[in-house]
């Protein structure tokens, strides 16, 4: 990778996921869309903390949100994530991929 812009974008994505709870959120969203309350219960983390981490992931365009009634549900952004097989989800960084294995 010699393009400084591409390197900067990649570093920003890696920085956004470089926190254990954010990795756990990504893992939870791998199975489908969820709202903040659902994620907080699954992760046993305070809602305010989940909201903060979702904000960071949303800012990096790793997750997307959609209003459904009274709730906002979050899902993985297909621009960065893909399921090429049933065995794993991949975060595509352009020059490399990070594998999130299915449990």
Where are each of the predicted segments found?
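Amphipathic alpha-helical dimerization/coiled-coil segments
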Residues: 1-5, 9, 78-103
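Single-residue recognition of alpha-helix boundary sites
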Residues: 33, 64, 86-88
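N-terminal helix-turn-helix DNA-binding core of bacterial DNA-binding proteins
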Residues: 9-15, 20-49, 55, 71-81
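Short, intrinsically disordered/low-complexity patches at protein termini
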Residues: 48-50, 59-60, 87-89
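Charged, low-complexity, helix/coiled-coil-prone segments
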Residues: 1-4, 13-14, 68
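Beta-hairpin "wing" of winged helix-turn-helix
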Residues: 59-68, 75
């Amino acid at each position: 990778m010699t393009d400084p812009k591409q390197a900067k974008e990649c570093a920003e994505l890696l920085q956004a996921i470089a926190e254990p709870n954010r990795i756990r959120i990504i893992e939870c969203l791998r199975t489908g869309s969820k709202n903040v309350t659902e994620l907080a219960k699954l992760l046993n983390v305070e809602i305010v903390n989940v909201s903060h981490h979702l904000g960071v992931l949303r800012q990096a365009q790793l997750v997307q949100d959609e209003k459904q009634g009274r709730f906002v549900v979050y899902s993985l952004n297909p621009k960065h994530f893909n399921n090429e097989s049933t065995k794993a989800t991949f975060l595509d960084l352009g020059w490399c991929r990070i594998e999130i294995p299915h449990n």
